[in-house]
Amino acid sequence: MEKKKYFIITIDTEGDNLWEWKEGTALGTENADFLKRFQNLCNQYQFKPTWLANWEMVNDDRFVAFAKNCLEKKQCEVGMHLHAWNTPPFYELPREERSGLSYLIEYPEDVMREKIITMTNLIENRFGKKPVTHRAGRWGMNDTYFKLLHEQGYIADCSVTPYVDWRTSIGQTPGFAGPDYSKETSEISFRQGVTEIPVTILRTEKNGVLWLRPNRRNLKEMLYVIEKNYESEHDYLMFMLHSSELMPGGSPTFKTEGGIERLYEHLEVIFKEISRNYTGVGLEEYMMLHEYFADQQK
């Protein structure tokens, strides 16, 4: 009997063009007006995006109204995405002259906990349901972070990027660097009471690591990832994108309306291919379909 395969869409739902954002400047959330087109495309294929939302987006009434409508129709899920630098409570970290934005794992444990509680409560208050799925800002996880997520009732995380080393992505404090996932695999694991469902990334000799993440130039590579993942033992395929990448000028990758049209051309191709062999599910729904994973939370 052929094993059932599931397609999980994860969207880091955050402010506009954070790649080029500078501290002290206004942080826009205009991309909230550009999410409906993507959701409609997902609906067309009966796919269910998980909008992993951060502080500024959950405080944006446009996003909340949009997501609530989709939640009521069971067309999406809302999980948590945490950017430590603008999520209360605020705590002054040491910094170097040339520093990056802070990772949550740079903060003392009690501050980490309070920031997680802040985001969890905000999402619950805005949507009427406590979030149970999560992705870390800047992909930064450690055992303490997993433990704190478990404390707050989270059941699944999707921050691990197999075969990818983020140590060149510096943090705020002197000498702090991002996580090294280069030795991680695509296998699901259980960490401090939380199920880790890694992003789908394929390691190849010729092209290095390949993601299911559109960048305008990688349609062929994405189709290859879809094909190889289907041939593998993995029962899920995980796509990722940022909400701001759905808006012209919302990212360095899709700067123009033409770039957005190319994005949707590629999305149509890969979604059609994926729909042949995969059933769309949200991240929480995927967990609920696997009783074994649920048992690990007890």
Q: What residues fall within each predicted segment?
A:
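Active-site beta->alpha N-cap acidic-glycine motif
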Residues: 2-73, 275
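Hydrophobic faces of well-ordered beta-strands that scaffold small-molecule active sites
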Residues: 7-11, 49-51, 78-82, 132-134, ...
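The substrate-binding groove and active-site-proximal loops of carbohydrate-active enzymes
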Residues: 20-30, 48-57, 100-112, 131-132, ...
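Acidic-and-aromatic substrate-binding clefts and catalytic sites of carbohydrate-active enzymes
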Residues: 26-32, 52-64, 86, 135-143, ...
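Acidic (Asp/Glu)-rich catalytic clusters
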Residues: 36-47, 58-87, 150, 189-192, ...
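Metal-dependent polysaccharide deacetylase catalytic core of the NodB/CE4 family, i.e.
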Residues: 55-136, 140
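Active-site-adjacent pocket scaffolds in enzyme catalytic domains
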Residues: 135-231
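C-terminal domain-boundary segment and adjacent tail
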Residues: 208-298
